[in-house]
């Protein structure tokens, strides 16, 4: 079964909820990543000098990650696969030595952040929709890395 219009709508509406409190949700996202993988701090230039609460670039990067996942959902609905609009994403991930386990950490942090953003609207269907969209994005990035 392919990605459905309902899944796309779930990702879209919850992405808007995420953006409504971008500062707090961005800090939460990177805090969750660093709790699971403290060494990942060195992969993000904007986290090297300080933690997630003191980084001016943190919001922009979090919005990009969530926006790319939102775009991945739309692509999965439209054509059943994800292609990267920014071809440099693969090279950047290679340069930062990103490996498979890092994608799993980011996915978990992404799902927990969406859950916090939507509150009682969280559901298994919403989790699945974001998970499938993120997996599509991750697969496209991994393909660009090789």
UniProtKB/Swiss-Prot annotation:
Oligomer and partners: Monomer.
Expression sites (tissue/organ): Specifically and strongly expressed in root nodules and at low levels in seedlings.
The keyword RNA-binding is assigned to this record: no
Disruption phenotype: Normal growth and flowering under non-restrictive nutrient conditions, but classic symptoms of extreme nitrogen limitation under restrictive nutrient conditions, including severely stunted growth, increased root/shoot ratio and delayed flowering. Following inoculation with symbiotic rhizobia, accumulation of free oxygen at the expense of reactive oxygen species (ROS, e.g.
Modified residues (Phosphoserine): 45
GO terms, molecular function: heme binding; metal ion binding; oxygen binding; oxygen carrier activity
Family: Belongs to the plant globin family.
Assigned GO CC terms: cytosol; host bacteroid-containing symbiosome; nucleus
Residues that bind heme b: 45, 64, 93, 96
Known function: Leghemoglobin that reversibly binds oxygen O(2) through a pentacoordinated heme iron. In root nodules, facilitates the diffusion of oxygen to the bacteroids while preventing the bacterial nitrogenase from being inactivated by buffering dioxygen, nitric oxide and carbon monoxide, and promoting the formation of reactive oxygen species (ROS, e.g. H(2)O(2)). This role is essential for symbiotic nitrogen fixation (SNF).
Induction context: Accumulates in developing root nodules upon inoculation with the symbiotic M.loti strain MAFF303099.
Post-translational modification comment from the UniProt entry: Nitrated in effective nodules and particularly in hypoxic conditions; this mechanism may play a protective role in the symbiosis by buffering toxic peroxynitrite NO(2)(-). Nitration level decrease during nodule senescence.
Primary gene name: LB2
Alphabetic keyword roster: Cytoplasm, Heme, Iron, Metal-binding, Nitration, Nitrogen fixation, Nodulation, Nucleus, Oxygen transport, Phosphoprotein, Transport
Presence of the UniProt keyword Transport in the record: yes
A single BP term in Gene Ontology: response to symbiotic bacterium
Protein name, per record: Leghemoglobin 2
């Amino acid at each position: 079964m392919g990605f459905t219009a309902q899944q796309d709508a779930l990702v879209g509406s919850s992405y808007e909820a995420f953006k409504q409190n971008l500062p707090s949700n961005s800090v939460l996202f990177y805090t969750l990543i660093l709790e699971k993988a403290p060494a990942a701090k060195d992969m993000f230039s904007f986290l090297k000098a300080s933690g997630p609460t003191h980084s001016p670039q943190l919001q922009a990067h979090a919005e990009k990650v969530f926006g790319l996942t939102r775009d991945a959902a739309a692509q999965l609905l439209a054509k059943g696969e994800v292609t990267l609009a920014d071809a440099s994403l693969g090279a950047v991930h290679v340069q930062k030595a990103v490996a498979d386990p890092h994608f799993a950490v980011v996915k978990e942090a992404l799902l927990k952040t969406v859950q916090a953003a939507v509150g009682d609207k969280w559901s298994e269907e919403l989790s699945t929709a974001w998970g499938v969209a993120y997996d599509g994005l991750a697969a496209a990035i991994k393909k660009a890395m090789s």
